[in-house]
């Protein structure tokens, strides 16, 4: 986890699913799929990633799964995997992306977990804790199935009206994130217009936005001068543009993903172990309509990338979708410098909080 240490308004961080009620066809069971495809050659670009996103389909015992969920969710996540790689490449990190546990090049291994309780135990507000407890128990009993510390947990809608899906947890907490499934959650519906197309953008875009949180990213906004070409930031309001108009990773999101376990090409034993960092000097100046920030830090683990956010009031939490941001590599072993042109800010009035991570 990234560890934040407050220094006035700045901080430094190391970026370092079966039950009788289900509608799933028995031929979709993981064992059957694995057996059928045991000789398949997987050529997915990120198949060699040593860590892979755990994708879980969690079904409360009084809710039905949604037909064809494996194929639909596989296409959505494979598309996102490629989109992330294109953005990482643009930001100078090569075509890195999150690993997926694949049955073949078009199908993801999705863990199906039947909940011990009904949907009332897993509400939107606060229900993630009960879900996560059962997911942890599942991986405790199946340790080889766990491919990383990162979980995407998808829960079928509690409301069976396809025009009004909702009910389960839908947010990111720590290295896990939660999203929902419903009958029209299908990549083919992105951009088709009408209510079906709009809801596909909201719920698919929302899933990928929450996945970003589950991969350690925070909210931010595309800098103003980049918006005409890069569009909307995924980790800003990209859940309302995904599949309709250009939606991109910002430089800060890409830098964060560069230090995420499931993007790594090497194994480590200390992922998200306790870390400490401190800014020991910080200075700023203003020249040529540009805010210049520089400083030095100490840390007990290597630092690869540093990010600064300028968040206009109200600050933080779910009020930071409008935070413009910059990312940079460290200078030497302990220094950083940012240049933040005013042309990249959308509103030059009011108060801002600066955060460094």
Describe the role of every protein-language-model region.
Residues 2-10:
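Sec-dependent signal peptide recognition
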Residues 15-18:
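C-terminal motif of bacterial Sec signal peptides marking the signal peptidase cleavage site
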Residues 20-26:
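Bacterial lipoprotein signal-peptidase II cleavage site
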Residues 28-150, 155-167, 314-335, 341-343:
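Propeptide-to-catalytic entry region of secreted or membrane-anchored zinc metalloproteases
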Residues 66-67, 191-201, 222-223:
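Active-site rim elements
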Residues 162-197, 240:
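Active-site scaffold of zinc-dependent metalloenzymes
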Residues 201-218:
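Active-site recognition of the HExxH zinc-binding catalytic motif
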């Amino acid at each position: 986890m990234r560890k934040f240490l407050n220094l006035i308004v700045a901080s430094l961080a190391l970026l370092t699913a079966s039950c009788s009620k289900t509608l799933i066809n028995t031929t979709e069971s993981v064992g059957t799929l694995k057996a059928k495809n045991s000789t398949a050659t997987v050529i997915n670009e990120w198949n060699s990633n040593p860590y892979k996103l755990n994708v879980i389909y969690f079904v409360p015992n009084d809710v039905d799964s949604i037909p064809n969920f494996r194929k639909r969710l596989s296409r959505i996540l494979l598309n996102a995997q490629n989109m992330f790689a294109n953005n990482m490449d643009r930001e100078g990190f090569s075509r890195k992306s999150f690993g997926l546990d694949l049955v073949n090049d078009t199908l993801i291994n999705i863990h199906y977990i039947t909940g011990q309780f009904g949907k009332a135990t897993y509400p939107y507000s606060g229900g993630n804790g009960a879900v996560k407890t059962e997911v942890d128990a599942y991986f405790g009993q199946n340790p080889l199935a766990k491919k990383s510390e990162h979980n995407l947990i998808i829960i079928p809608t509690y409301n069976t009206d396809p025009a009004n899906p909702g009910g389960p947890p839908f947010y990111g907490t720590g290295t896990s994130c939660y999203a929902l499934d419903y009958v029209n959650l299908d990549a083919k519906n992105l951009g088709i217009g009408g209510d079906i197309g709009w809801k596909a953008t909201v719920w698919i875009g929302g899933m990928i936005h929450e996945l970003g949180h589950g991969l350690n990213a925070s909210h931010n906004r595309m800098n103003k001068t980049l918006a005409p070409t890069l569009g909307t930031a995924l980790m800003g309001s990209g859940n309302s543009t995904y599949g309709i108009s250009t939606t991109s990773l910002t430089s800060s999101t890409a830098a964060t993903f560069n230090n995420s376990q499931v993007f790594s090409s090497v194994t480590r034993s200390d992922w998200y172990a306790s870390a400490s960092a401190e800014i020991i000097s910080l200075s700023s100046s203003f020249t040529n309509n540009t805010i210049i920030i520089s400083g030095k830090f100490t840390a007990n683990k290597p630092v690869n990338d540093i990010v600064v956010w300028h968040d206009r009031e109200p600050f933080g939490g779910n009020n930071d979708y409008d935070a413009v941001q910059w990312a940079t590599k460290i200078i030497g072993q302990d220094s950083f410098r940012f240049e933040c042109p005013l042309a990249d800010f959308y509103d030059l009035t009011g108060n801002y909080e600066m955060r460094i991570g």
